[in-house]
């Protein structure tokens, strides 16, 4: 392993992190806002989804969980930008959000047609693992209100320019929901940067979300456009490979022997291609 690569890489990232000019709290209504889908999570406890007769309900979403965690753990002023069908399920999700202390004023409420033909709310069944049995997640999120968001639906000028936001977080799950959600991300990050808001993005590659809309090729097309506006990029080596096209050299096919130098070199290449990344 070439140890000379690690100090150089760490130094470059540390210098960039120190240059994260987060806006003054007094000038902003929110410390952080998220953009993404928030689903009703149904948990069968110790049981199996396919045999359960009762579920415990929660709310959750890859991007939203960051806002909730910052509010509950650190008392930060957070809000979630999302869309929900205006029915009892949507209002239940809102109630969970309120319980978590997250501001719900930025939710876009979409009229419900009574059966979900035009719009609905997402469900996520989550089964915990036990022993050698792996955990299982089953998402029912097609045709959801948030997947229908398109550029112009959210007043980003008002959010970033008038209300003020110190940190904006979104990710690859939301970007993969539809052609238009990717466009909404780009619209949002451009406006965030215009007003000096720090942008973080979780690549969070999910093959199931991309496979029917172009797979890795589409994921890279979308994420490369977004990456140009990101300050803090989050992901593992699989995310950087699938979403941004970088490769780790020297690993065997089964990943039984890992080439640490290869990971360092890949990350060094990442910061060369995207000098705007201040932290990875």
Regions found by a protein language model. Give the residues of each.
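Short, Lys/Arg-enriched N-terminal segments with co-localized hydrophobic residues
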Residues: 3-17
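Hydrophobic beta-strand scaffold residues
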Residues: 78, 104, 199-201, 234
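Conserved N-terminal subdomain of the carbohydrate kinase-like
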Residues: 77-172
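Positively charged, low-complexity intrinsically disordered leader regions
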Residues: 18-49
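Conserved phosphate/ATP/ADP-binding segment of small-molecule kinases
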Residues: 206-280
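Alpha-helix C-terminal capping segments
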Residues: 58, 65-77, 99
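Short pre-catalytic strand/loop immediately N-terminal to key active-site residues, enriched for Gly-Thr
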Residues: 51-60
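Glycine/threonine-rich flexible loop motifs
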Residues: 175-183, 211, 244-245
């Amino acid at each position: 392993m070439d140890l000379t690569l690690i100090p150089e890489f760490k130094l470059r990232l540390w210098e960039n992190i120190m240059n994260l000019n987060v806006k003054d709290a007094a000038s902003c209504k929110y410390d952080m806002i998220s953009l993404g889908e928030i689903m009703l999570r149904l948990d069968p406890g110790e049981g199996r989804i396919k045999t359960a007769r009762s579920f415990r309900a929660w709310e959750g979403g890859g991007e939203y969980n960051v806002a909730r965690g910052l509010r509950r753990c650190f008392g930060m002023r957070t809000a979630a930008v999302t869309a929900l069908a205006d029915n009892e399920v949507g209002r239940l999700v809102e109630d969970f959000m309120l319980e978590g202390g997250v501001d719900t004023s930025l939710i876009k409420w979409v009229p419900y047609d009574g059966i979900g033909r035009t719009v609905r709310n997402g469900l996520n069944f989550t089964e915990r693992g036990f022993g050698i049995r792996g955990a299982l997640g089953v998402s029912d999120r097609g045709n959801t209100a948030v997947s229908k968001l398109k550029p112009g639906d959210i007043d980003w000028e008002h959010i970033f320019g008038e209300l003020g936001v110190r940190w904006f977080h979104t990710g690859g799950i939301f970007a993969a929901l539809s052609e238009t959600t990717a466009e909404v991300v780009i619209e949002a990050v451009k406006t965030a940067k215009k007003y000096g808001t720090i942008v973080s993005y979780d690549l969070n590659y999910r093959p199931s979300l991309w496979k029917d809309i172009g797979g890795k090729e589409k994921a890279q097309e979308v994420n490369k456009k977004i990456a140009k506006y990101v300050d803090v990029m989050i992901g593992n080596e699989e995310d950087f490979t699938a979403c941004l096209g970088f490769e780790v050299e020297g690993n065997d096919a089964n990943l039984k022997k890992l080439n640490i130098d290869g990971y360092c070199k890949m990350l060094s290449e990442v910061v060369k291609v995207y000098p705007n990344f201040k932290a990875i």
